[in-house]
Amino acid sequence: MAYPLQLGLQDATSPIMEELMNFHDHTLMIVFLISSLVLYIISLMLTTKLTHTSTMDAQEVETIWTILPAVILIMIALPSLRILYMMDEINNPVLTVKTMGHQWYWSYEYTDYEDLCFDSYMVPTNDLKPGELRLLEVDNRVVLPMELPIRMLISSEDVLHSWAVPSLGLKTDAIPGRLNQATVTSNRPGLFYGQCSEICGSNHSFMPIVLEMVPLKHFENWSASMI
């Protein structure tokens, strides 16, 4: 989860988030190099007073500043497209969970089980226990097995919502009348927090998401106790 004054991204929990962080570093380095070059040229012009008032045509320079930006854009676009395709791929999911957005809570249905469904509301501040997080705790967590591909089907009952868990690299719109899907795969156990990331009304800020990733054996015990 995020902390006050945090400058970096949250720790990656899924392969997709690891790829996104690598892509972020790759793109940031390109931006840093271009910015440094531009600032160096500007400072050089201001300090040396070098100008070329007589230059009317420079075919080589024009060729370079046409080809070079194209190469840079390709270097950014190719890794980005690769990650986009990875995010859309869902290979043999072991579990499917249907998520519905409401004003202002989430409901979950484990479609592989007959009667495993529940609503998930934010815990009011007055009901928090010591150590729990304000505006992030819920009464019913989404319990999922770790290290296994899980398909999330996401939609909405009323207005636009967005189901987002940053540490897993997830952000999928919940649109009324449309079923979107995403893949959840966690490399480690733990609690992972998210929130609705689409302004959906007066209580938009009070729609937290909590995923509890556990070993498969613990998940089987939990699901048996819930049915």
Curated annotation (Swiss-Prot):
GO terms for biological process: ATP synthesis coupled electron transport. Keywords: Copper, Electron transport, Magnesium, Membrane, Metal-binding, Mitochondrion, Mitochondrion inner membrane, Respiratory chain, Translocase, Transmembrane, Transmembrane helix, Transport. Residues 46-59 are mitochondrial matrix. The keyword Metal-binding applies. Gene3D superfamilies: 1.10.287.90, Cupredoxins - blue copper proteins. PROSITE patterns: COX2, COX2_CUA, COX2_TM. The keyword Electron transport applies. It is an enzyme of class 7 (translocase). GO terms for molecular function: copper ion binding; cytochrome-c oxidase activity. GO terms for cellular component: mitochondrial inner membrane; respiratory chain complex IV. Cu cation A2 binds at C196, E198, C200, H204. It is a multi-pass membrane protein. Its cofactor is Cu cation. InterPro entries: CcO_II (IPR045187), CcO_II-like_C (IPR002429), CcO_II_C (IPR034210), Copper_CuA (IPR001505), Cupredoxin (IPR008972), Cyt_c_oxidase_su2 (IPR014222), Cyt_c_oxidase_su2_TM_dom (IPR011759), Cyt_c_oxidase_su2_TM_sf (IPR036257). Binds a dinuclear copper A center per subunit. Its EC number is 7.1.1.9. SUPFAM superfamilies: Cupredoxins, Cytochrome c oxidase subunit II-like, transmembrane region. Mg(2+) binds at E198. Component of the cytochrome c oxidase, the last enzyme in the mitochondrial electron transport chain which drives oxidative phosphorylation. The respiratory chain contains 3 multisubunit complexes succinate dehydrogenase (complex II, CII), ubiquinol-cytochrome c oxidoreductase (cytochrome b-c1 complex, complex III, CIII) and cytochrome c oxidase (complex IV, CIV), that cooperate to transfer electrons derived from NADH and succinate to molecular oxygen, creating an electrochemical gradient over the inner membrane that drives transmembrane transport and the ATP synthase. Belongs to the cytochrome c oxidase subunit 2 family. Component of the cytochrome c oxidase (complex IV, CIV), a multisubunit enzyme composed of 14 subunits. The complex is composed of a catalytic core of 3 subunits MT-CO1, MT-CO2 and MT-CO3, encoded in the mitochondrial DNA, and 11 supernumerary subunits COX4I, COX5A, COX5B, COX6A, COX6B, COX6C, COX7A, COX7B, COX7C, COX8 and NDUFA4, which are encoded in the nuclear genome. This is Cytochrome c oxidase subunit 2. It comes from Zelotomys hildegardeae (Hildegarde's broad-headed mouse). The lineage of its organism: Eukaryota, Metazoa, Chordata, Craniata, Vertebrata. The gene is MT-CO2.
